[in-house]
Structure formats: C-alpha cells, structure tokens
C-alpha cells in the first residue's frame, strides 16, 4: 500500500477546492480498483492514503502537468 496524489491519465492531479475532509476525494480514492483507505483535499489536489501499489500517483514519469 502507498500514499500519494491521485492522477488522471494525463498525469494531472485530481483537483479539489474544499481543503481537508472532502467527499469527492474520499470517493475517488476509495474506489475498488484504486483500493485506498481514505482521501482528502490537500494543496488543491486529492491526496489518498492506503492506495494499491498498482495505482498511479503524482508525479508520473514523462508527464508534465
């Protein structure tokens, strides 16, 4: 398991505006295929805890966002 910022296929962080506890980030992070335990908004990006090792996190190699 790992922690990190959730990214989309372009390598950009999932953006959020409500810092701290955030339903959107928590839902995205805890989806079955991502395997996260918890998600919240930190620095205007969705930060996830306990992600599956296979889930990509920011920064992605060769992607500038």
Swiss-Prot record:
GO molecular function: sodium channel inhibitor activity; toxin activity
One GO-annotated biological process of the protein: defense response
Domain spans labelled LCN-type CS-alpha/beta: 2-65
Record-annotated disulphide pairs: 12-65, 16-41, 25-46, 29-48
CDD domains for the chain: neurotoxins_LC_scorpion
Pfam family for this entry, one: Toxin_3
Gene Ontology CC annotations of this record: extracellular region
Tissue specificity remark: Expressed by the venom gland.
Subcellular location(s) per record: Secreted
Keywords: Disulfide bond, Secreted, Toxin
Record PROSITE patterns: LCN_CSAB (PS51863)
Residue ranges of the TM segments: none
Other facts noted in the record for this chain: Negative results: does not modify the currents of the human voltage-gated sodium channels Nav1.1/SCN1A, Nav1.2/SCN2A, Nav1.3/SCN3A, Nav 1.4/SCN4A, Nav1.5/SCN5A, Nav1.6/SCN8A and Nav1.7/SCN9A.
Protein task: A probable toxin that has no activity on the tested sodium channels (when tested at 200 nM) and is not toxic to mice, crickets or sweet water shrimps. It resembles Beta toxins that bind voltage-independently at site-4 of sodium channels and shift the voltage of activation toward more negative potentials, thereby affecting sodium channel activation and promoting spontaneous and repetitive firing.
Domain notes: Has the structural arrangement of an alpha-helix connected to antiparallel beta-sheets by disulfide bonds (CS-alpha/beta).
Family, similarity comment: Belongs to the long (4 C-C) scorpion toxin superfamily. Sodium channel inhibitor family. Beta subfamily.
The name this protein goes by in its record: Toxin Cbo5
Source organism per UniProt: Centruroides bonito
């Amino acid at each position: 398991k790992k922690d990190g910022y959730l990214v989309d296929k372009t390598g950009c962080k999932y953006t959020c505006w409500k810092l701290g506890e955030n339903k959107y980030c928590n839902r995205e992070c805890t989806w079955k295929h991502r395997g996260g335990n918890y998600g919240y908004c930190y620095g205007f990006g969705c930060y996830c805890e306990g992600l599956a090792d296979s889930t990509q996190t920011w920064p992605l190699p060769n992607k500038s966002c």
